[in-house]
């Protein structure tokens, strides 16, 4: 795996944050805004559609590390030649809206083909939420054997969750967190939680074993760079606060005279 030290460090510290512009988003002005906001807020990397023209547009305004997402290995191959940092098979939401579903065998086939074409690229694969938890664990294990570098979990798609905004976000985040918790306990790859992640829910992802999170829909609703930066800062503050709480709890337990009485679970 070839990955920048900044990205690797953020994953190691369980503080990686990526901004997702969307697999079906070709709105260049909006993508540029999100790229600039991400760079100002110092997010780990930006996740965009696998399109060489959009890569050029982003690179014209920002030096932020780039991940490109697609479901076809040839599209990823084209983008890899531009020097992007991460290639991702995933972001299926726009396909779910069309009734297009992805199952384990197809994901493995695409992953094998991509790895064979690009043996040294950093590859991430999203586990489809339509799979049962045990199927997601099996797929993640198979992907680890194929040589995939990172796994992303997702929640129920917006086309399936026909609820109000807050309820839908909670439902989606609960779904991706349950996948993150189970998968992270079975494999040794970094896990990214995405879908329904907000400043409210982001700390939970790391408690459940995530090495990073992806946010997108809440940022795309904002109209200017300043608002986007403020929202990203809110998420980062929530993550930082959670890490401080974890450190304090761990320190208190380790220094406590009754720590041996605690029951591990």
Curated annotation (Swiss-Prot):
Gene this chain is encoded by: ycf23
Source species: Porphyra purpurea
Record-given protein name: Uncharacterized protein ycf23
Plastid listed as a keyword: yes
Cellular component, GO annotation: chloroplast
InterPro entries xrefs: Uncharacterised_Ycf23 (IPR007570)
First-listed, main subcellular location of the protein, grouped into a coarse class: plastid
Highest taxon, organism lineage: Eukaryota
UniProt-annotated location(s): Plastid, Chloroplast
Chloroplast among keywords: yes
UniProt record similarity statement: Belongs to the ycf23 family.
Keywords, alphabetical: Chloroplast, Plastid
């Amino acid at each position: 795996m070839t990955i920048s030290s900044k990205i690797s460090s953020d994953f190691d510290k369980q503080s990686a944050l990526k901004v997702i512009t969307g697999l079906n988003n070709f709105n260049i002005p909006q993508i540029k805004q999100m790229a600039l906001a991400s760079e100002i807020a110092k997010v780990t990397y930006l996740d965009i559609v696998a399109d060489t023209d959009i890569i050029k547009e982003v690179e014209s305004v920002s030096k932020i590390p780039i991940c490109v997402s697609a479901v076809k290995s040839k599209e990823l191959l084209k983008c890899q030649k531009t020097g992007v940092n991460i290639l991702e098979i995933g972001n299926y939401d726009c396909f779910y809206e069309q009734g297009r579903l992805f199952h384990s065998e197809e994901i493995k086939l695409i992953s094998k083909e991509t790895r064979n074409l690009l043996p040294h690229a950093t590859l991430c694969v999203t586990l489809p939420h339509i799979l049962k938890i045990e199927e997601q664990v099996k797929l993640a294990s198979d992907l680890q054997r194929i040589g995939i570098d990172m796994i992303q979990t997702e929640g129920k798609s917006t086309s399936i969750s026909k609820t109000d905004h807050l309820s839908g976000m909670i439902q989606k985040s609960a779904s991706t967190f349950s996948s993150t918790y189970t998968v992270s306990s079975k494999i040794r790859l970094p896990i990214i939680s995405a879908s329904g992640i907000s400043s409210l829910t982001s700390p939970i992802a790391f408690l459940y074993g995530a090495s990073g999170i992806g946010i997108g829909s809440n940022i795309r609703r904002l109209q200017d760079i300043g608002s986007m930066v403020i929202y990203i800062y809110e998420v980062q503050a929530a993550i930082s606060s959670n890490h401080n709480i974890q450190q304090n709890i761990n320190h208190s337990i380790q220094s406590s005279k009754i720590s041996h009485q605690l029951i591990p679970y």
